[in-house]
Amino acid sequence: LHNIIETSGGAVVCEEMCTGTRYFENLVDESKTTLDEQFMALSERYMKTNCACFTPNTGRIDDLLRMVKEYKIDGVIDCSLKFCCLYDTEKYSVSRALKEAGTPVLSLETDYADTDAEQLRTRIGAFIEMLND
């Protein structure tokens, strides 16, 4: 997906996917000394993750709006994995919040198969062209 965006004239300045920046946010507190404290610190770190599985999840929308401002984002590509019902459920709320904030949004769904590549390239290219107008 990043390659398609960048070869279509866009720039990925930030991302909020499951395996992306979330992995590095809210690191585990390593100052705990007992096993119980360490397990609690690990649990707290996982529970701070703003994932669609914690619906309703206003924290995720707040994070997205913060990132749009912080990284001066022109438009958001909201991509979800096909058949990930949790992200599909949240897609409407995310799109509405971003549009209300004046940020253009392109919602995509893919299974990351090679057969999706050209359709994604067409939609992403049109979105980037719209942002540049």
Predicted regions located by residue number:
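A short, acidic, amphipathic alpha-helical segment used as a generic capping/interface helix at domain edges
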Residues: 55-72, 89-90
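Glycan-processing catalytic domains of CAZymes
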Residues: 31, 46-47, 75, 110, ...
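Acidic beta-strand-to-loop metal/phosphate-binding motif
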Residues: 73-82
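Redox- and metal-dependent alpha/beta enzyme cores, enriched for Fe-S-associated oxidoreductases
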Residues: 1-56, 60-63
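Peripheral docking tails and interdomain loops at the edges
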Residues: 92-133
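Acidic-and-aromatic substrate-binding clefts and catalytic sites of carbohydrate-active enzymes
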Residues: 54-56, 84-88, 113-117
